[in-house]
Protein backbone atom coordinates (compact mmCIF):
# COMPACT_ATOMS: atom_id res chain seq x y z
CA UNK A 1 0.00 0.00 0.00
CA UNK A 2 1.47 3.38 -1.00
CA UNK A 3 1.22 6.64 0.88
CA UNK A 4 1.74 9.50 -1.60
CA UNK A 5 2.54 12.91 -0.05
CA UNK A 6 2.84 11.29 3.35
CA UNK A 7 -0.86 10.54 3.63
CA UNK A 8 -2.75 7.24 3.72
CA UNK A 9 -3.83 6.00 0.32
CA UNK A 10 -7.62 5.67 0.43
CA UNK A 11 -8.67 3.05 -2.08
CA UNK A 12 -11.91 3.71 -3.91
CA UNK A 13 -12.84 0.07 -4.34
CA UNK A 14 -16.05 -1.42 -5.61
CA UNK A 15 -18.99 -1.62 -3.25
CA UNK A 16 -17.64 -4.80 -1.70
CA UNK A 17 -14.58 -2.84 -0.54
CA UNK A 18 -14.45 -0.19 2.12
CA UNK A 19 -17.39 2.14 1.76
CA UNK A 20 -18.76 4.97 3.83
CA UNK A 21 -22.03 3.16 4.50
CA UNK A 22 -22.39 4.03 8.18
CA UNK A 23 -25.40 6.26 7.50
CA UNK A 24 -27.46 4.00 5.27
CA UNK A 25 -26.89 0.74 7.15
CA UNK A 26 -27.68 1.83 10.68
CA UNK A 27 -30.38 -0.70 11.48
CA UNK A 28 -31.17 -0.14 15.15
CA UNK A 29 -30.06 -3.44 16.57
CA UNK A 30 -27.50 -1.11 18.22
CA UNK A 31 -25.29 -1.33 21.27
CA UNK A 32 -28.17 -1.44 23.78
CA UNK A 33 -25.81 -0.70 26.67
CA UNK A 34 -23.45 -3.59 25.94
CA UNK A 35 -19.72 -3.12 26.02
CA UNK A 36 -17.72 -3.79 22.87
CA UNK A 37 -16.09 -6.73 24.65
CA UNK A 38 -19.49 -8.32 25.32
CA UNK A 39 -20.62 -7.78 21.72
CA UNK A 40 -17.46 -9.45 20.41
CA UNK A 41 -17.89 -12.31 22.88
CA UNK A 42 -21.45 -12.98 21.66
CA UNK A 43 -20.32 -12.83 18.04
CA UNK A 44 -17.40 -15.18 18.68
CA UNK A 45 -19.73 -17.64 20.42
CA UNK A 46 -22.01 -17.56 17.39
CA UNK A 47 -19.12 -18.08 14.94
CA UNK A 48 -17.94 -21.06 17.00
CA UNK A 49 -21.44 -22.58 17.23
CA UNK A 50 -21.87 -22.63 13.44
CA UNK A 51 -18.29 -23.74 12.74
CA UNK A 52 -17.31 -20.50 11.02
CA UNK A 53 -14.31 -19.48 13.13
CA UNK A 54 -12.47 -20.16 16.37
CA UNK A 55 -11.63 -16.81 17.94
CA UNK A 56 -11.17 -16.18 21.67
CA UNK A 57 -10.21 -13.41 24.04
CA UNK A 58 -6.74 -13.90 25.46
CA UNK A 59 -6.70 -14.22 29.27
CA UNK A 60 -5.33 -11.22 31.16
CA UNK A 61 -2.02 -12.21 32.80
CA UNK A 62 -2.03 -12.22 36.61
CA UNK A 63 0.96 -11.77 38.90
CA UNK A 64 0.54 -13.78 42.10
CA UNK A 65 2.13 -12.11 45.12
CA UNK A 66 1.02 -14.14 48.13
CA UNK A 67 -0.23 -17.72 48.43
CA UNK A 68 -1.18 -19.65 51.54
CA UNK A 69 -1.57 -23.39 51.94
CA UNK A 70 -4.23 -24.12 54.60
CA UNK A 71 -4.23 -27.69 53.37
CA UNK A 72 -1.55 -29.59 51.51
CA UNK A 73 -3.89 -30.26 48.61
CA UNK A 74 -5.36 -26.75 48.48
CA UNK A 75 -3.64 -23.44 47.73
CA UNK A 76 -5.35 -20.10 48.40
CA UNK A 77 -4.25 -16.97 46.54
CA UNK A 78 -4.15 -14.13 49.10
CA UNK A 79 -2.86 -11.33 46.88
CA UNK A 80 -2.58 -10.95 43.10
CA UNK A 81 -2.50 -8.19 40.51
CA UNK A 82 -3.51 -7.94 36.87
CA UNK A 83 -0.51 -7.30 34.66
CA UNK A 84 -0.50 -5.23 31.47
CA UNK A 85 -1.14 -7.62 28.54
CA UNK A 86 1.90 -8.02 26.32
CA UNK A 87 -0.07 -8.55 23.10
CA UNK A 88 -3.58 -7.87 21.78
CA UNK A 89 -7.04 -8.80 23.06
CA UNK A 90 -8.17 -11.51 20.63
CA UNK A 91 -6.78 -14.15 18.30
CA UNK A 92 -7.90 -17.23 16.42
CA UNK A 93 -8.42 -18.92 13.07
CA UNK A 94 -10.89 -18.02 10.33
CA UNK A 95 -11.05 -19.86 7.01
CA UNK A 96 -7.35 -20.73 7.18
CA UNK A 97 -6.30 -17.19 8.17
CA UNK A 98 -4.72 -16.28 11.48
CA UNK A 99 -6.69 -13.41 13.05
CA UNK A 100 -5.26 -11.12 15.73
CA UNK A 101 -6.82 -7.88 16.91
CA UNK A 102 -7.23 -5.29 19.64
CA UNK A 103 -10.65 -3.91 20.62
CA UNK A 104 -11.14 -0.39 21.94
CA UNK A 105 -14.06 1.93 22.53
CA UNK A 106 -14.20 5.65 23.16
CA UNK A 107 -16.83 8.19 24.19
CA UNK A 108 -15.14 10.77 21.99
CA UNK A 109 -17.41 11.78 19.08
CA UNK A 110 -14.76 13.12 16.74
CA UNK A 111 -11.58 11.06 17.18
CA UNK A 112 -9.91 8.00 18.68
CA UNK A 113 -7.10 8.87 21.15
CA UNK A 114 -3.96 6.86 20.45
CA UNK A 115 -2.89 6.99 24.08
CA UNK A 116 -5.28 4.03 24.48
CA UNK A 117 -2.83 1.84 22.52
CA UNK A 118 0.47 0.54 23.90
CA UNK A 119 3.73 0.25 21.98
CA UNK A 120 4.07 -3.48 22.65
CA UNK A 121 0.62 -4.08 21.15
CA UNK A 122 1.62 -2.27 17.97
CA UNK A 123 4.84 -4.26 17.73
CA UNK A 124 2.84 -7.47 18.13
CA UNK A 125 0.41 -6.49 15.35
CA UNK A 126 3.35 -5.59 13.12
CA UNK A 127 4.90 -9.03 13.70
CA UNK A 128 1.57 -10.71 12.88
CA UNK A 129 1.22 -8.67 9.69
CA UNK A 130 4.77 -9.51 8.59
CA UNK A 131 3.95 -13.22 8.98
CA UNK A 132 0.92 -12.79 6.65
CA UNK A 133 -1.57 -12.88 9.50
CA UNK A 134 -4.55 -10.51 9.62
CA UNK A 135 -4.02 -7.81 12.26
CA UNK A 136 -6.41 -4.97 12.95
CA UNK A 137 -8.22 -2.85 15.50
CA UNK A 138 -11.94 -2.90 16.24
CA UNK A 139 -12.88 0.62 17.32
CA UNK A 140 -16.25 1.57 18.71
CA UNK A 141 -17.39 5.18 18.97
CA UNK A 142 -19.76 4.68 21.87
CA UNK A 143 -21.65 7.98 21.56
CA UNK A 144 -22.08 7.56 17.80
CA UNK A 145 -22.89 3.84 18.20
CA UNK A 146 -20.56 3.03 15.29
CA UNK A 147 -17.96 0.27 15.05
CA UNK A 148 -15.09 0.09 12.55
CA UNK A 149 -12.38 -2.37 11.60
CA UNK A 150 -9.12 -0.49 11.02
CA UNK A 151 -6.47 -2.66 9.31
CA UNK A 152 -2.91 -2.63 10.59
CA UNK A 153 -1.39 -0.99 7.49
CA UNK A 154 -3.27 2.33 7.66
CA UNK A 155 -3.11 2.22 11.45
CA UNK A 156 0.69 2.02 11.24
CA UNK A 157 0.73 5.38 9.43
CA UNK A 158 -1.38 7.01 12.14
CA UNK A 159 0.78 5.44 14.84
CA UNK A 160 3.99 6.82 13.30
CA UNK A 161 2.32 10.22 13.08
CA UNK A 162 1.53 9.92 16.78
CA UNK A 163 5.12 8.94 17.63
CA UNK A 164 6.37 11.98 15.73
CA UNK A 165 4.04 14.11 17.90
CA UNK A 166 2.21 15.39 14.84
CA UNK A 167 -1.22 14.26 15.97
CA UNK A 168 -2.35 12.42 19.10
CA UNK A 169 -5.49 10.86 17.67
CA UNK A 170 -7.19 9.47 14.56
CA UNK A 171 -10.24 11.43 13.47
CA UNK A 172 -13.50 9.59 12.92
CA UNK A 173 -13.40 10.68 9.27
CA UNK A 174 -9.93 9.16 8.83
CA UNK A 175 -11.20 5.90 10.30
CA UNK A 176 -14.26 5.95 8.03
CA UNK A 177 -12.04 6.45 4.97
CA UNK A 178 -9.38 3.87 5.88
CA UNK A 179 -11.46 1.32 7.77
CA UNK A 180 -14.54 -0.85 7.33
CA UNK A 181 -17.83 -0.01 8.97
CA UNK A 182 -19.45 -2.91 10.86
CA UNK A 183 -23.22 -2.41 11.16
CA UNK A 184 -25.13 -4.04 13.99
CA UNK A 185 -27.42 -6.91 13.07
CA UNK A 186 -29.46 -9.59 14.79
CA UNK A 187 -27.17 -12.61 14.49
CA UNK A 188 -24.32 -12.23 15.08
CA UNK A 189 -24.59 -8.84 16.77
CA UNK A 190 -21.30 -7.63 15.35
CA UNK A 191 -20.48 -9.48 12.15
CA UNK A 192 -16.88 -8.31 11.95
CA UNK A 193 -15.83 -11.31 9.84
CA UNK A 194 -17.77 -9.75 6.96
CA UNK A 195 -15.40 -6.78 7.22
CA UNK A 196 -12.46 -9.20 7.42
CA UNK A 197 -13.63 -10.74 4.13
CA UNK A 198 -13.55 -7.29 2.52
CA UNK A 199 -10.08 -6.67 3.93
CA UNK A 200 -8.81 -9.99 2.54
CA UNK A 201 -10.29 -9.15 -0.88
CA UNK A 202 -8.75 -5.68 -0.93
CA UNK A 203 -5.32 -6.95 0.12
CA UNK A 204 -5.41 -9.71 -2.50
CA UNK A 205 -6.20 -7.11 -5.19
CA UNK A 206 -3.29 -4.97 -3.97
CA UNK A 207 -0.91 -7.89 -4.54
CA UNK A 208 -2.05 -8.47 -8.13
Curated annotation (Swiss-Prot):
Cofactor binding mode and count: Binds 1 Mg(2+) ion per subunit.
Keyword Nuclease included in the entry's annotation: yes
Biological process (GO), any one: DNA recombination
Required co-factors: Mg(2+)
Keyword Aminoacyl-tRNA synthetase recorded: no
Subcellular compartments: Cytoplasm
EC number: 3.1.21.10
Gene Ontology MF, one: magnesium ion binding
Gene3D superfamilies: 3.40.1350.10
Annotated region described as Disordered, given as residue ranges: 1-25
GO cellular component, one term: cytoplasm
Family annotation (SUPFAM superfamilies): Restriction endonuclease-like
Annotated keywords: Cytoplasm, DNA damage, DNA recombination, DNA repair, Endonuclease, Hydrolase, Magnesium, Metal-binding, Nuclease
CDD domains attached to this UniProt entry: RecU-like
Residue runs in coiled coils: none
Family membership: Belongs to the RecU family.
Function statement: Endonuclease that resolves Holliday junction intermediates in genetic recombination. Cleaves mobile four-strand junctions by introducing symmetrical nicks in paired strands. Promotes annealing of linear ssDNA with homologous dsDNA. Required for DNA repair, homologous recombination and chromosome segregation.
NCBIfam families (alphabetical): PRK02234.1-2 (NF002581), PRK02234.1-4 (NF002583), PRK02234.1-5 (NF002584), recU (TIGR00648)
HAMAP family referenced in this protein's UniProt entry, alphabetically: RecU
Protein name, entry field: Holliday junction resolvase RecU
Gene: recU
Amino acid sequence: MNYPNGKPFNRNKTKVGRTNDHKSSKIKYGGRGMTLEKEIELSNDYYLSIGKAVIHKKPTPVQIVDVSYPKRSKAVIKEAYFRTPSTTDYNGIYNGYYIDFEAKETKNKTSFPLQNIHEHQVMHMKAVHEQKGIAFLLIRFKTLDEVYLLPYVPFEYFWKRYQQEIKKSITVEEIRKNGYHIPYQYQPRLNYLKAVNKLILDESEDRV
